[in-house]
């Protein structure tokens, strides 16, 4: 059990108590929010100041936390792990900015859980893996407690505790810190969430998930100090801009959503609807044809390599997608969606599976993980942005393309430095935006506006 499982235990127990809870996830992750939504019944919202902005993070949290009695944010990595955490230089605390900086003025924990906690003025519950600790637990807790005095460590959850004797040693060690113990989770070898090459297996592929959530709720009912924990989770009234009005639906967008394609930010889908799009969800795995009377297509990321055979065997859909795009229908394809538009996917075993063939290249699975935030500059006018426009996104994949386009969409670099990552992305045909870079449109509402403008032109 790790941070995500502890979070799910909290959410499951709250829902068993019939409490409405809104969950959030720090960072760009897609899969953890799927688990949150499965438990709470509400879309989880990502809080990522790199993909969006600090202001957007504040407004997103304020807007959605007001809708429920309780709010819970799951962090990312360690508390202070941000995109510039590897900068080695003296640290100082810039009280006027509320950010931790080095002697170059760089924020050293930007986009970390600590950064979000400061930005939203939220208390932090520290989850400590105690499986190989006794007295050292106090040193760890004290280190986190004192590292940045602006972070409010409200208490600790002791995770993977062994015997009663082990728990006694941990409690004795923590007494001098006067830090509340808000939960104790014993070692649970029978509670595991399967994972694979890109992290946890998504919820749609776990038939036993409901039984697992029930076990987590049982655990949560007894392992947490709810009397002291519930006040920390209570949603507080926060000022935020009014919800934008929905434009009348004037266009239909086919959104591929099934076991193969399920990496979407709910905020992106909401934006499309607010701008007047009717979203038609469909399955390239199961459907007999693409949806009728649509003026655009949106293929998110996911795991087409896992379902490559089933995608390949659905020839009517493959042919329909290719025909529609070649006839001019605008299409966004991110990562897994990009792979689906290729001629073929070559899986981890070297087997080749035919895809739609819109793009004259193949996606080859491999061991190398490409991961990180990207700054991407558009090299030409394309479906979504004008030449010279800079967008911020992230990559997370274990595939590569056999052919680089002669006129790529973007020149990319790492977000936290000037290291050039090369050119990527297909914008040919001109009505296609196919890229490994995942985008959150909270930073640039102009992107979905431009997409829908092109869809209306096609209509």
Show which residues each predicted segment covers.
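Beta-strand->loop->alpha-helix junctions that form or flank phosphate-binding loops
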Residues: 25-26, 181-189, 278-286
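Phosphate-binding active sites in nucleotide-utilizing proteins
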Residues: 251-326
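Residues that mark the start of a beta-strand
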Residues: 19-22, 250-252, 278, 355
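ATP-dependent carboxylate-amine ligase catalytic core
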Residues: 1, 5-85, 105-119, 128-152, ...
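Internal gly/pro-rich beta-alpha loop/helix module
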Residues: 134-240
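Cysteine-nucleophile active-site neighborhood
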Residues: 304-382
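Intrinsic disorder/low-complexity segments
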Residues: 65, 84-108, 236-250, 456-459
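Amide-donor transfer/coupling interface in amidating biosynthetic enzymes
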Residues: 191-240, 365-459
């Amino acid at each position: 059990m790790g941070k995500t499982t502890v979070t799910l235990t909290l959410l499951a127990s709250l829902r068993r108590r019939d409490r409405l809870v809104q969950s959030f996830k720090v960072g760009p992750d897609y899969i953890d929010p799927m688990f949150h939504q499965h438990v709470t019944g509400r879309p989880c919202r990502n809080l990522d100041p790199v993909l969006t902005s600090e202001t957007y993070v504040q407004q997103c949290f304020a807007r959605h936390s007001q809708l429920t009695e309780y709010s819970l944010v799951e962090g990312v990595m360690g508390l202070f792990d941000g995109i510039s955490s590897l900068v080695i230089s003296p640290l100082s605390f810039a009280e006027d900015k509320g950010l931790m900086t080095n002697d170059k003025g760089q924020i050293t924990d930007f986009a970390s859980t600590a950064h979000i906690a400061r930005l939203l003025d939220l208390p932090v519950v520290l989850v400590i893996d105690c499986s190989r600790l006794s007295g050292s637990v106090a040193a760890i807790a004290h280190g986190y407690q004192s590292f940045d005095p602006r972070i409010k460590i409200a208490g600790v959850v002791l995770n993977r505790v062994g015997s009663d004797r082990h728990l006694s040693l941990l409690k004795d060690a923590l007494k001098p810190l006067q830090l509340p113990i808000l939960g104790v989770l014993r070692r649970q070898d029978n509670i595991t969430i399967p994972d694979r090459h890109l992290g946890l297996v998504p919820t749609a592929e776990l038939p036993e998930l409901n039984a697992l959530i029930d076990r987590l709720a049982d655990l949560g009912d007894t392992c947490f100090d709810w009397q002291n924990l519930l006040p920390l989770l209570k949603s507080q009234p926060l000022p935020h801009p009014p919800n934008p009005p929905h434009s009348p639906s004037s266009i239909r967008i086919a959104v591929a959503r099934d076991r193969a394609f399920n990496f979407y930010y709910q905020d992106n889908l909401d934006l499309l609807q607010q701008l007047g799009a009717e979203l038609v969800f469909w399955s390239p795995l199961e459907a007999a044809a693409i949806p009728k009377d649509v003026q655009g297509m949106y293929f998110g990321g996911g795991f087409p390599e896992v379902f490559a055979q089933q995608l390949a065997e659905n020839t009517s859909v493959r042919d329909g997608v290719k025909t529609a795009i070649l006839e001019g229908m605008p299409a966004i394809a991110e990562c897994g969606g990009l792979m689906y538009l290729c001629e073929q996917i070559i899986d981890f075993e070297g087997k080749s599976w035919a895809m739609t063939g819109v793009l004259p290249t193949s996606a080859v699975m491999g061991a190398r993980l490409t991961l990180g935030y990207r700054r991407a500059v558009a090299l030409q006018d394309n479906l979504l942005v004008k030449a010279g426009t800079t967008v911020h996104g992230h990559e997370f994949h274990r595939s590569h393309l056999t052919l680089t386009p002669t006129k790529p969409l973007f020149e990319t670099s790492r977000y936290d430095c000037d290291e050039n990552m090369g050119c990527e992305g297909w914008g040919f045909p001109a009505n296609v935006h196919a890229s490994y870079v995942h985008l959150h449109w909270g930073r640039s509402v102009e992107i979905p506006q431009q997409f829908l403008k092109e869809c209306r032109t096609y209509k």
